[in-house]
């Protein structure tokens, strides 16, 4: 019987999509366990990145000896805050492991196959035709130590971004797409000028995604952010960072009392300064940034 490996890998990717942008610096991975042509278990990388998907898929199965594991990314081989995923794969006596991408993390890169070979487990890298760019953000994270950055820009037909006669230059469909987009990023980068003007919550207001509130970074070098804003209601449950000049250090106490976290920078004049800011955001624990301003 011919096995459609891409079918099961695509199932794994559909699982991984669910937590995209919700796993901090770890990639969102999906795993599917197949035995005798039947999916007997599945797993996704947990929120905030741990446990990993392979562990979630295999931990509670009593009898998966001889089964095949399909996972979107090469199983990790190193000890970190959790044991390597190859351990539980070996322990559960998985027969075959198929994965769509090699992990660019130097601690794991191309090492899983060597371990599986030693244990008599067949493993194979199978590229997915439908998800060939899925880990683009993760590869950028690992290569440059910066977050993956996407800019959302709303522009009218006459190439304007503001309409003084209407609050919106977009329609309901495009606004819903923005809410979906926000759900796939762990933080949003905006400016005090934009937030003061719109008083936007910058959250996900769409059925099924209401609980997803990406953390927020606000560039405000001159500390012009208004003290009374709608987003202030969520400062206790949503991390909000105020990025300002070191020269304004002594003027941040009121914002701290409200619940803002302060990030001090020297300047923000060119792309080099912006890249330094991105590195700072990445070190804070964010891998995917959506710019809205």
Feature locations, PLM:
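Short helix-loop-beta connector
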Residues: 63-67, 184, 287
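Active-site ligand-binding patch in enzyme domains
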Residues: 140, 144-146, 150-286
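Zn2+-dependent cytidine deaminase-like catalytic core
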Residues: 33-130, 246
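Short, small/polar residue-rich loop motifs at catalytic or cofactor-binding pockets
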Residues: 25-28, 148-149
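Residue-level signal for inorganic ion chemistry
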Residues: 12, 30, 76, 116, ...
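Short beta-strand scaffold segments in enzyme catalytic cores
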Residues: 28-37, 153-154
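Short, basic/aromatic recognition patches
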Residues: 2-24
């Amino acid at each position: 019987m011919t096995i459609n490996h891409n079918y099961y890998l695509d199932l794994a990717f559909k699982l991984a999509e669910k937590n995209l942008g919700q796993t901090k610096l770890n990639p969102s991975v999906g795993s599917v366990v197949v035995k005798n042509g039947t999916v007997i278990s599945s797993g996704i990388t947990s929120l905030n990145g741990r446990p990993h998907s392979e562990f979630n898929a295999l931990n509670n199965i009593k009898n998966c000896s001889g089964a095949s594991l399909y996972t979107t990314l090469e199983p990790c081989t190193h000890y970190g805050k959790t044991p390597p995923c190859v351990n539980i794969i070996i322990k559960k006596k998985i027969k075959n492991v198929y994965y769509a991408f090699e992990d660019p993390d130097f601690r794991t890169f191309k090492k899983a196959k060597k371990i599986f070979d030693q244990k008599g487990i067949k493993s194979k890298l199978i590229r997915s035709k439908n998800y060939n760019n899925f880990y683009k953000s993760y590869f950028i994270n690992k290569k440059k130590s910066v977050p993956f950055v996407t800019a959302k820009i709303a522009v009218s037909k006459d190439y304007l971004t503001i309409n003084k006669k209407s609050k919106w230059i977009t329609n309901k469909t495009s606004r819903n797409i923005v809410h979906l987009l926000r759900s796939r990023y762990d933080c949003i980068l905006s400016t005090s000028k934009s937030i003061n003007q719109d008083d936007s919550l910058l959250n996900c207001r769409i059925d099924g995604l209401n609980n997803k509130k990406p953390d927020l970074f606000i560039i405000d070098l001159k500390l012009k952010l208004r003290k009374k804003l709608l987003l202030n209601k969520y400062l206790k449950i949503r991390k909000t960072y105020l990025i300002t000049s070191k020269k304004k250090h002594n003027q941040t106490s009121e914002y701290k009392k409200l619940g803002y976290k302060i990030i001090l920078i020297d300047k923000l004049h060119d792309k080099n300064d912006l890249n330094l800011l991105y590195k700072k955001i990445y070190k804070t624990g964010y891998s995917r940034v959506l710019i809205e301003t």
